[in-house]
Amino acid sequence: MLTNHRSPHWLRHSARWPGFLVLALPILLFSPLAQAASAGELDLTSSLPGFIAVTLFLAAYVLVMAEEKLHMRKSKPVLVAAGLIWAMIGWVYVHAGLPDASEEAFSETLLEYSELLLFLLVAMTYINAMEERRVFDKLRAWLVEKGFSYRSLFWITGILAFWISTIANNLTTAMLMCAVVLKVAEGDKRFINLCCINVVVASNAGGAFSPFGDITTLMVWQAKLVEFQEFFELLGPALVNYLVPAIVMSLFIKNRKPAALEEHIWLKRGARRIVLLFLVTIVISVLCHTMLNLPPALGMMTGLGFLQFFGYYLRQSLPRSLERKRTRYSQRGDWRKLESLGSVVPFDVFTRIARSEWDTLLFFYGVVMSVGGLGFMGYLALLSETLYTGWDPVWANIVLGLVSSVVDNIPVMFAVISMEPDMSMGNWLLITLTAGVGGSLLSVGSAAGVALMGQARGIYTFASHMRWAPVIALGYVASVVVHLMINADSFAIFH
């Protein structure tokens, strides 16, 4: 790391760091990864361009938090902020005679983002493909048809949300389980609300111990701070985080049985094979990272190639498949299935890619590059010294988990990785856990909670979630205590 901290006389500013900490701290907690965000040769933390950069990012994030009211995509403000921040850095470094330093820092930050972009793009494509092949609809229909009691349904949707979120994003998982609850709940608002809270907590907890469960865990794994198999040490704490509030809430659910509903859903052709290809892709990406020391994105992109070949096979063989099914259904007199063949459309991989959450991916770029710029100016190194030197890392990580209930956990984790604190594996696992499950404390603390407020509008609300916040907080504390107890040895391990 270059730490010369030279600053041209025309950049010096009378304001000093302690007074600026009040403004900078909340901003930098909102920020991302960019391992290239190490402080540059020039210390710009007390300069006018530095103050402008922080103000730009703060203003952009205020607009992001007002996304619902402004009806403006969250990627817009951070994309502009990232461009302006790096433009100022480039201008300063060119005038200081150091153009290569800023170019190299930008390129390294962009490379880190690109690897994550490719990984997430493939994962989203597979999830979209499984959704289009009706894999999730089939699961929902199966749950609806079984006629489980309310208490059983509460536990089944929670447990499924916990495990599905280890490979699928918590947003998809939560909305799938909420759809089941809304279908069978017969307008029981209390039951719907408790199930929504349970699903949000479960999906966030499930993603906390899997490298594929959340963007935050993916980044910790890709940064080689925690090895793939080491994440599973968080399984016990994550289960405790989910089970403590779930057990308490289940006591308030009447054990009556709703009427069984009949819903016929057929998997589209190739659905099971796409699920298998997704699992194979995950295995390949893990092997690339652990055995070949190559980025996981390589394995994911290879898996995308497999999906494209399989999509080609589905398209080429579709006419023959339709003809065989028409003959079979006609002979059996199954007119319902015969009629459904008229709506069959060919599988197209690029349509699934186009349906990825591009606003999220572009927002991700804006935050990564913005914080990469702020880190290159020297702010993250300064904050790291304040937070992780002034405090015990355990307490710092617990507090940052609480911060993630208000601020999206992706920027929180990115900020920590960018600070590069010297922490044990146990502490890296701790921040992974707290940043992952801290969002459950408030309904707005995770994408799952925000989505369910819209899906169960007027039933699951910010206030209804807050009423159970003490129980959720109890689960948060219990999960931290369990981690400190059962994984005590990991706090002596440094990678």
UniProtKB/Swiss-Prot annotation:
The record's Gene Ontology cellular component field reads:
plasma membrane
**Gene Ontology annotations of biological process type:** sodium ion transport
Annotated S-S bridges: none
Query: Does the UniProt entry include the keyword Lyase?
Result: no
Record's subcellular location: Cell inner membrane
> In terms of one coarse class, where is the protein primarily found?
membrane
Summarize the record's induction comment.
Induced by hyperosmotic shock.
Q: Which GO terms describe its molecular function?
A: antiporter activity
**InterPro entries documented for this protein:** Cit_transptr-like_dom, NhaD-like
UniProt xrefs under PANTHER family: SODIUM/PROTON ANTIPORTER 1-RELATED, SODIUM_PROTON ANTIPORTER 1-RELATED
- Role, per record: Na(+)/H(+) antiporter that imports sodium into the cell in exchange for protons. Can also transport lithium. May be involved in adaptation to marine habitats.
Q: Which family does it belong to?
A: Belongs to the NhaD Na(+)/H(+) (TC 2.A.62) antiporter family.
Write down what this protein is called.
Answer: Na(+)/H(+) antiporter NhaD
UniProt organism field: Halomonas elongata (strain ATCC 33173 / DSM 2581 / NBRC 15536 / NCIMB 2198 / 1H9)
Q: What is the lineage of its organism?
A: Bacteria, Pseudomonadati, Pseudomonadota, Gammaproteobacteria, Oceanospirillales
